C-alpha cells in the first residue's frame, strides 16, 4: 500500500493511501503535555496507544457508534476513513479534575451529578481556548443541530465507556473526543481514544493516564501497559 505523509502531529503521522477516502495513522513514541511545552520520546508508547485505541474503536463500532476506524494494520498503524476534522475538542467530565478544578477552584475527584460537556477551539496559536455554543456558531464551526449532535453523541459514547472501564476496575474521570465529516458529510468520531486523551483512576485513586507524564508520577508505559492488560479482560 503506497503512502505519502500529509500531516505530522504531536502523537501521530497521517499518510495517504491508494484510496482517496482512506488514510493510515501511525502512532509515535512521542509524549507531549501543556500543548507541546513538555515533550519526550518514550519507547513503546506508540504501540500501546495503537493497541488501546484500536480496541476501543472496535468496541464502539460494534456498539453502533459511527467512527473513522477501519482496522489495525500493524503494531503502530491503523487504517482510518478520511475525514474533515471539526476544529473542536469535545471534552466530557464525569468528575472534577485538571483544568476544570483549577478554573473553578474545586478539589479533584468530585462526582458531577450530570456529566458536563465542554468545547475547546482547536488552535495551537491560541492555546486551544475554552469556548461556548455561541462562540462555535460565531466561528462558523458548527450550527445548532450539529452542536446538539456532538453533545448527544459524546454523552452516548460516555455511557458505553463508563461501563467498560468500570468492569475492569477503572473510573472514567474525563476524556476528549474529536469528530469530523466523512465523504458523505456525516459527522463521525475520529482521532483516537487512549490514556493520552482521557483520565482514568483506579480504586486507590492512582492515575492511569497521561497525568503520570504531566505530573511526573511514574513511568508512562508501565501505566499504559496495565490499562491495556485490563482492557483485554473485556474480550
Swiss-Prot record:
Matching SUPFAM superfamilies = SAICAR synthase-like (SSF56104)
Entries under HAMAP family matching the protein? SAICAR_synth
Q: Which family does it belong to?
A: Belongs to the SAICAR synthetase family.
User: Which Gene3D superfamilies does the UniProt record give?
Assistant: ATP-grasp fold, B domain, Phosphorylase Kinase, domain 1
Q: Which UniProt keywords apply?
A: ATP-binding, Ligase, Nucleotide-binding, Purine biosynthesis
Pathway terms, separated by semicolons:
Purine metabolism; IMP biosynthesis via de novo pathway; 5-amino-1-(5-phospho-D-ribosyl)imidazole-4-carboxamide from 5-amino-1-(5-phospho-D-ribosyl)imidazole-4-carboxylate: step 1/2
* Keyword ATP-binding in record: yes
Q: Decide whether keyword Phosphoprotein is in the record.
A: no
**What catalytic activity is recorded?**
5-amino-1-(5-phospho-D-ribosyl)imidazole-4-carboxylate + L-aspartate + ATP = (2S)-2-[5-amino-1-(5-phospho-beta-D-ribosyl)imidazole-4-carboxamido]succinate + ADP + phosphate + 2 H(+)
Going by the record, the broad EC class of this enzyme is: ligase
E.C. number: 6.3.2.6
Which BP terms in the Gene Ontology apply to this protein? 'de novo' IMP biosynthetic process; cobalamin biosynthetic process
GO molecular function annotations of the record: ATP binding; phosphoribosylaminoimidazolesuccinocarboxamide synthase activity
**What's this protein's name?**
Phosphoribosylaminoimidazole-succinocarboxamide synthase
Amino acid at each position: 500500500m503506497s503512502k505519502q505523509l500529509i500531516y505530522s502531529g504531536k502523537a501521530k503521522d497521517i499518510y495517504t493511501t491508494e484510496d482517496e477516502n482512506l488514510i493510515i495513522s501511525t502512532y509515535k513514541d512521542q509524549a507531549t503535555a501543556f500543548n507541546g511545552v513538555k515533550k519526550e520520546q518514550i519507547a513503546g508508547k506508540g504501540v500501546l496507544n495503537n493497541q488501546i485505541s484500536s480496541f476501543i474503536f472496535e468496541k464502539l463500532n460494534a456498539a453502533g457508534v459511527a467512527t473513522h476506524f477501519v482496522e489495525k494494520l500493524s503494531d503502530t498503524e491503523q487504517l482510518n476513513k478520511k475525514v474533515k476534522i471539526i476544529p473542536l475538542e469535545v471534552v466530557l467530565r464525569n468528575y472534577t479534575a485538571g483544568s476544570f478544578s483549577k478554573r473553578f477552584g474545586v478539589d479533584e475527584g468530585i462526582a458531577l451529578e450530570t456529566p458536563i460537556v465542554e468545547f475547546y477551539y482547536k488552535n495551537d496559536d491560541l492555546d486551544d481556548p475554552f469556548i461556548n455554543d455561541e462562540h462555535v456558531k460565531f466561528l462558523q464551526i458548527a450550527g445548532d443541530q450539529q452542536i446538539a449532535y456532538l453533545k448527544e453523541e459524546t454523552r452516548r459514547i460516555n455511557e458505553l465507556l463508563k461501563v467498560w472501564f468500570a468492569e475492569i476496575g477503572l473510573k472514567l474521570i474525563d476524556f476528549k473526543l474529536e469528530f469530523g465529516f466523512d465523504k458523505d458529510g456525516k459527522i463521525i468520531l475520529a482521532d483516537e481514544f487512549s490514556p493520552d486523551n482521557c483520565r482514568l483512576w483506579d480504586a486507590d485513586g492512582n492515575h492511569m493516564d497521561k497525568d503520570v507524564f504531566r505530573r511526573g508520577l511514574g513511568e508512562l508505559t508501565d501505566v499504559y501497559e496495565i490499562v491495556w492488560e485490563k482492557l483485554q479482560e473485556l474480550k
